[in-house]
Amino acid sequence: MSEWTVNEDGRVIVRVLVRGLVHVAREEIAGAETSVRRARLEGDSSAPGSIRQLRIAIRRIEYQLATMADVDSSLDIDDLVKGLHEVGKPFGQLRDAEILSARVAKVLRARGVTPESDRLLEAVADEHYRAQRASDGWLDSEEFHRTLEDLNEFRLTLPTDAVTPTMARPIAQHAIRVTWRSVKRAAKLAKEESRDELLHALRRKVKHAVYLTRGFSYVLGPSSEEFALRLVTLQKLLGRQHDHVVVAAWLQGIGGDYASLKPLTDDVSLEERRRADHGAEEWAEPWQFVRDFRPKETVMTSYSFFD
């Protein structure tokens, strides 16, 4: 939670800023959804680019709203944030299946074709097919459309006042401070004990910071994009580490289900585990790169609207 209480003027500006974030999200989600449905009609059931845009748009507004609720708890949007999280899950699972397909195919190509590798590729294809079907079905689900309706209804409760960047900057700066503090806490935990789940939590907090910083770039000015780019460098490294973790875990599971594949899956899983461990040792440098960013004061500092 925020360590300051937002005063009445500040609450109005919070809501104006949030309305802008929601407006952008609705446009992005609607555009991506339209592209996915058009691709379906044209016979392309996967539409990976549009699905990716849809997944990112949903996750971005979820993270942005979660942080703004920390800035001003009177927004009372916990249920909406939870709904957006659930709505995004099938698309995240499809993304994991796509990463799995690409990683396993790459590793097996280097090893050469065997009956076991062919069977493993079939299992990977089955996993991807199930994830694809689940995301397709989710697009037509009542839950998906109800959550998007809830998002729009929330938007309609927000003020339509116009505010200048100068008026909005103190609130935007404080929002970035809130998410930056959560990033630093997550990094401290990950440095103390470099477990997969702590690195994953850090990656999520970094994404919170990226999405919010870019969402308010028109208020914060050009230095905010440099800050976001540094965060993205860290996010991508942590993302690759997490991908190796996911692939290694899946291979262990499938090896338990198919005894004939276990020698191969154990071997490939070990390779992925080593890559994950290597990634877990590499994040200190990009983290320092983020911490060395000097114009943070212009991105984060100001308390004018806080009591």
What are these regions (language model features)?
Residues 1-307:
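Cationic, histidine-enriched alpha-helical/coil surfaces that engage anionic ligands
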